Amino acid sequence: MSTLEVKDLHVSVEDKEILKGINLTVNTGEIHALMGPNGNGKSTLLMAIMGHPTYHVTQGSITLDGKDVLAMSVDERSKAGIFLALQYPAEINGVTNSDFLKAAVNAHRETPISLFKFIRELDTAIEDLKLKGEIAHRFVNEGFSGGEKKRNEIVQMKLLKPAIALLDEIDSGLDVDAIKIVADNILQLQEESPMGLMIVSHYDRFYQLVKPTFAHVMVNGQIIAEGDQQLVEKIDSEGYEWLLKEKNIILESEKVEKKISLGSCANNPRGNK
């Protein structure tokens, strides 16, 4: 069993504090829904856990099974069992998908995987995600549709079998059938090789399919509410306004907008900075 612990995490980007004291624990077998309005720190949290250099941890800790994640490089975090599926997967020209995935698998093993076993596992994962076999021989994400990119992230996750998986809007841009395919494969892997999951999504339908164990709502870089599937359903039906009123919270983006008066616009009619 693995445990990812985030304690009092503060993260800044270009001297602007984005996360302001996040506390979160994810255990093997759990699925955590990370919710909140756009621009309130959800993706920042995932990026900080994975070690993206743009996101600077200024306070707090991240541990995986008691080991200091912040002391690890991105590669070391990956080898330790942390996986991040990006919202916008990058294209890698000149590197075939199969070569990239084989290298990723071998980086997590003490001895290289046999070619026969790798091909068998890759073919199975591609088939499970309802992708065409030719995708293995194309350059990574080059010319892939948005849906192919997202499903290819799940192919990689199935091959790596991480301890902790962070999925950043893995369902965005997918049609109804593709969303179900992705959700089914997440649950299948969870059953075959249990992991802890943290999933960012704006769609209740996706959460209905993966059935999160816990739900967390992030606003202004803080977790303001926690619950389970019932919280997900209430937000889907009523939005976030009731929660903001209950907690007496104003979105920081709205605070900025209120500072822009008619007078300031009149003094700057062309919008010059």
Where are the regions that the model predicts?
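ABC ATPase NBD Q-loop/coupling interface
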Residues: 61-77, 141
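Conserved beta-strand-loop-alpha-helix hinge in the C-terminal portion
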Residues: 218, 222-245
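Walker B catalytic motif
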Residues: 169-170, 177
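The feature captures the beta-strand-to-loop junction immediately N-terminal to the Walker
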Residues: 35-37
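Short coil-to-beta microelement around the adenine-binding A-loop and adjacent beta1/P-loop entry
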Residues: 16-17, 76
